[in-house]
Each structure stands twice: as structure tokens, then as C-alpha cells.
Amino acid sequence: MKLIIFLTVTLCTLVTGLDSVYIRQYYKLSHKHRPQHRECQCLNGGTCITYRFFSQIKRCLCPEGYGGLHCEIDTNSICYSGNGEDYRGMAEDPGCLYWDHPSVIRWGDYHADLKNALQLGLGKHNYCRNPNGRSRPWCYTKRRYSIQETPCSTIEKCERTCGQRSFSKYFKIVGGSQAEVETQPWIAGIFQNIMGTDQFLCGGSLIDPCWVLTAAHCFYNPTKKQPNKSVYKVFLGKSILNTNDEHEQVFMVDEIISHPDFTDHTGGNDNDIALIRIRTASGQCAVESNYVRTVCLPEKNLNLYDNTWCEIAGYGKQNSYDIYYAQRLMSATVNLISQDDCKNKYYDSTRVTDNMVCAGDPLWETDACKGDSGGPMVCEHNGRMTLYGIVSWGDGCAKKNKPGVYTRVTRYLNWIDSNMNAVFTKSRSFREPK
């Protein structure tokens, strides 16, 4: 009898103490499932592990700062961003019911038994979440013989962090300088799989944890055929193109929304703007770090002065005659050029429309080039870097009297907002059956 009790206690210790030093020594990595973590569904860099003598027992070994069965809980999160849709912290209000509470499962629209519960942040806990896109995180509380959605008051909204970088560090886009990704943490690299190989296509800018803004001409097809989303990947936090970076985040493309009025028939690229919705295999969006941050969108009526100093960044060619793209992220400074000069002095009013803004180096030594398309032109406004333009087109690279032409982002704020909200609404409209 004592032997049976001893063996039972020992087995329980082995099963429940997976995150201890003992388990790190006696558990092995489940190489069979590691690449996609399909059985464990480990998030946030968690590792699927299995016990040597109990191969059917699989759990996630979480990195520091994360917990939960799938490493889905951010134990360090103390505030929420936006409306808190992506909040995965541990805040709870008095009276919050567990998401797997029988009353919640029976009466609630959102609960731990949904097929997409893990992606919504729901589980065997009562932490505040926002699975339906309300104004802030909430939880279910009892209301007599029913339950109700109650906004959480114990957690506050994070201070706005867009357009801020951890530091500015430049090392030598045409005539520019090598840049660490921390100086341009909103820069995105869009890759296309061609014959089994991921090849760099265009740049982009992270404007929301789930959204990248880029140029429509990157996906333009004269036949109007919709691009195949499955062949694209988006990288964030990447300083060097063809090497793995420990700080990078990799995403699949969930949606590609190009402006319906994009055209290149005038000789320029008009309405050259596109939105990309990104997600990981587990349904997550970008996680903020020193290497990955959002850039601020401009105010609707923002009109910066001529000669305002701005920055461009990308992985494009350093010279128009180069065969290969730059391996490192490059950055350069340009000055805004008046609309009148751009239309009449450097180009013409047919190619340059009011949907565009021009910028160039006074000495014509630095410029965006092939491969920088879709990338950011950011200008400082109210102490934050603001996405004022999207690299669109030009006549050569750093060619005298031929400045770069950029999509004027202020002209598309309503389009950006309406399309992001439309996709959000669509994604919420297909509710899981109870």
C-alpha cells in the first residue's frame, strides 16, 4: 500500500512540475512536434516538451515572462494598448467569473470552450479580455440569475508608444547609412515565396500590431487577379535580410487590401497604398519590443513645411545599377519639396497628383531606390516619428532634379480606418457555435 501511494505521489510530481529544474533535466524536447508546436500549441516562444518515460504527456515550457498551459499569458503586462483586444495579462476585477465557468459557457457568447478560445485569450482563468472588440477589456460578472459583460477597472490603458524608438544609432537607400532596426522599429520586410524560396519584395510600416501599410504597386497585377496571400511573409525587427535575427518576428499574411483606384497609367503611381493584415500561425499579432514598434499615423490635416527634414529606410538597392539588394537595413535623410516645385520644376502635373508628396536630398546624393518601395518616410511631429509618406516611385535613384515621390498618407486616413474596421468586423461576425 505504501509503495502504491509513493508511486502515485511521484507520478503527480512529475506531471505537474514541468517548469522546474528537475523537469528541465528529465524532460526532452519533442523534436517530432517542435517546428509548428501543433500538439502543444505553444505561443510566445514556448517549447513543446514530453517526459522521457511518459511520451503521451506533452506540455509547454514557457520563456520568462509568460505562463499558462500554452504560454499565452503575459505575466509582465500591466496595461493594455488600443482597445485591449490583444491584452493577455493577469488583471482581474472582483467578481470576474472564470471563462470556463458553467454559467459563462451556458450563457456567454465568449468562453473557454470556443474553438478559437486560445486565440481570443480565453481559458481556465478569470483575467480581463476583449474578445469582441469593445472599448476596453472586460469580464463576465453575475447579475441575479444571469451574467453580464463588465468593463474592467483594475487595468489602465498604456501610454501611446507609436513613433518612439529606443535609441538612434547610425553606421553608410542610395548614399545612406547602415541602420540598426531599433532606429526604425516600424520597418517591415515583405517576402514572396518564388519556387520554394522566400525572396524580398517590398518594405512596409507597422501602423498597428496587426497591420502593415505598404505600396499597392508591390502587389499589382494587370489582370486584376487577387494576390495569393499564402506566398507572402512579413518580417519585423530585421536588420539583415538573409540571416535569422534573434529579435525578428515572422508573420503570415491574412489580408491584402490594395486601393481600388491604384493606377500607373499616368506615368506615376496614383493611390499607391495597400494594407496587409498579419498574424502568426497561432493567430497572434506583433509584440512590442525595442526592435518592433508601431509608427504614428499623421493627423488628418497635417501639412508639414517645405524643407522639413524626414527619414527614409529600407532594404533596397544602394545604386540603381546594382544587381542585388542591400543586405542590411539602410536609412537616409531627405527634405520635403513643395508641391509646386515637384509638379512644375521636377516632374509634371500629370504624373504628380495631390495624393503624392515629393522629397529629396538638396545635394541629390541620397534617395530611395528599387526595393525600398512600400517603405516609410517618417517625419518628426510633436516629438514622435510620423508616417508622412510611403515610398512609391521616382525617375532613377538619387538622380539630379528627380526627387523621390511618396504616397501622401494624410489623404488616406479614412480609407485606412474603414478597411481595418471592416476586416475586424468580418473576423468577429463568424461566431463559434456554443
Curated annotation (Swiss-Prot):
The active site is at 217 (charge relay system), 272 (charge relay system), 373 (charge relay system). Glycans are attached at residue 228. It comes from the Eukaryota. Residues 36-72 form the EGF-like domain. Residues 1-20 form the signal peptide. Its EC number is 3.4.21.73. It is an enzyme of class 3 (hydrolase). Specifically cleaves the zymogen plasminogen to form the active enzyme plasmin. This is Urokinase-type plasminogen activator. It comes from Gallus gallus (Chicken). The gene is PLAU.
